[in-house]
């Protein structure tokens, strides 16, 4: 899918806000730690290449989800270290080694397959993944970790790091977080040798668990100005949302009482009503669940009426407006604001998902 440059729906990304958020984190966390931002999933919908280039001087490296995301950054001349957080197929490790991309080693079985490849492994860097309670990828005992270190040393693979990921660092109840912390620390204490990087701090841990002293802080959603807990925990300092979502009115009409709007005729007017059409729909990541939610027109809340279509949706206006009038879906307009978390709460999901679902059809504009 290609971006639609001629379509009047845009995500406005404030790169200065992202830089400012990182600067605030640098004052909050361990001063000796390096920040490695998570720019996976196209930097949570903000644009991985643009974000990476904008903050490169502030960070030690970057974290991505898969090898293709890492290759994209290298192809756009991002030279800082890159760590792939998910496992990759062993057949592709030579690509990572050639491009100086560090890989997650999720298991001894995976590493055994890697060393069977006819590849030059001396340039390969690995971070052993530890499953301390997330249940996703990673080893669960120190014996397997030490066998992996021994195998890496035998084949001259650079055992660069070891890490885990906390499942509940953004929750008020710290019981499971502390259990994971204890499991990870136990494995660290039993390692045959320590790597350069030991890291477990994600955004939530950096915000609310400063006792974590790490070489790397993996900064994610809050770099983009959002609270990882939604509205559960209060942020220790103010951050600025970096993305706003705007469109325009492309069609306006007055319809009589008793008329219906949208697929399924799910909305019926009770009086003469001004209806505006906005060029965004579920193919753009603005899902059908948004029926009944609000947008902002001239600083006023306007209801989304009828089912959201694939490419367009309809809103109830308080009066007639000129074609091209701005419609704010996420962001501030005059005295009112709609946040990404507001959208997430309406859908019954999290702010991460709202951003990541914004499709490539929505052009990104950087300031």
From Swiss-Prot:
Lipid metabolism listed as a keyword: no
Gene for this chain: alr
GO terms, biological process: D-alanine biosynthetic process; peptidoglycan biosynthetic process
UniProt keyword annotations, A-Z: Isomerase, Pyridoxal phosphate
Modified positions (N6-(pyridoxal phosphate)lysine) in chain numbering: 40
Name assigned to this protein: Alanine racemase
Record: active site: 40 (proton acceptor), 263 (proton acceptor)
Names of the cofactor(s): pyridoxal 5'-phosphate
InterPro entries (UniProt xref): Ala_racemase, Ala_racemase/Decarboxylase_C, Ala_racemase_C, Ala_racemase_N, Ala_racemase_pyridoxalP-BS, PLP-binding_barrel
GO molecular function, one term: alanine racemase activity
GO CC terms in record: cytosol
Catalytic activity field: L-alanine = D-alanine
Chain residues that bind substrate: 136, 310
EC number from the UniProt entry: 5.1.1.1
Protein's pathway: Amino-acid biosynthesis; D-alanine biosynthesis; D-alanine from L-alanine: step 1/1
Keyword hit for Transcription: no
Function: Catalyzes the interconversion of L-alanine and D-alanine. May also act on other amino acids.
Family, per entry: Belongs to the alanine racemase family.
């Amino acid at each position: 899918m290609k971006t639609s440059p001629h379509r009047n729906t845009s995500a406005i990304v404030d790169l200065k806000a992202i830089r400012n958020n990182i600067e605030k984190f640098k004052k909050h966390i361990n001063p000796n730690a390096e920040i490695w931002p998570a720019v996976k999933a196209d930097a949570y919908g903000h644009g991985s290449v643009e974000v990476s280039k904008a903050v490169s001087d502030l960070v030690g490296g970057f974290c991505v989800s898969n090898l293709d995301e890492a290759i994209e950054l290298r192809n756009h001349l991002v030279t800082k270290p890159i760590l792939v957080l998910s496992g990759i197929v062993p057949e592709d490790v030579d690509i990572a080694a050639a491009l100086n991309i560090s890989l997650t080693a999720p298991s001894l079985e995976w590493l055994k397959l890697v060393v069977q490849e006819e590849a030059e492994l001396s340039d390969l860097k690995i971070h052993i993944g530890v499953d301390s309670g997330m249940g996703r990828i990673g080893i669960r005992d120190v014996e397997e970790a030490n066998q992996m270190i021994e195998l890496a040393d035998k084949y001259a693979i650079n055992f660069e790091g070891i890490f885990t990921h906390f499942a509940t660092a953004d929750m008020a109840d710290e019981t499971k977080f502390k259990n994971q912390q204890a499991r990870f620390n136990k494995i660290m204490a039993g390692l045959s040798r320590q790597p350069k990087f030991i890291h477990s701090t994600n955004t939530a841990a950096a915000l609310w668990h400063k006792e974590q002293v790490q070489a790397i802080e993996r900064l994610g959603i809050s770099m983009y100005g959002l609270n990882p807990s939604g509205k559960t925990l209060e942020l220790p300092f103010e951050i600025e949302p970096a993305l706003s979502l705007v469109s325009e009115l492309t069609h306006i009409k007055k319809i009589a009482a008793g008329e219906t709007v949208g697929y399924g005729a799910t909305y019926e007017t009770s009086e003469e009503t001004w209806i505006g059409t906005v060029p965004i729909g579920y193919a753009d990541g603005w899902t059908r669940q948004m029926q009944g939610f609000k947008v902002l027109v001239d600083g006023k809340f306007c209801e989304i009426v009828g089912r959201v279509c694939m490419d367009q949706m309809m809103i109830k206006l308080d009066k007639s407006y000129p074609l091209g009038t701005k419609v704010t879906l996420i962001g501030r307009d005059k005295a009112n604001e709609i946040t990404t978390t507001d959208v997430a709460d309406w859908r019954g999901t999290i702010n991460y998902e709202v951003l990541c679902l914004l499709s490539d059809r929505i052009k990104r504009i950087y300031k």
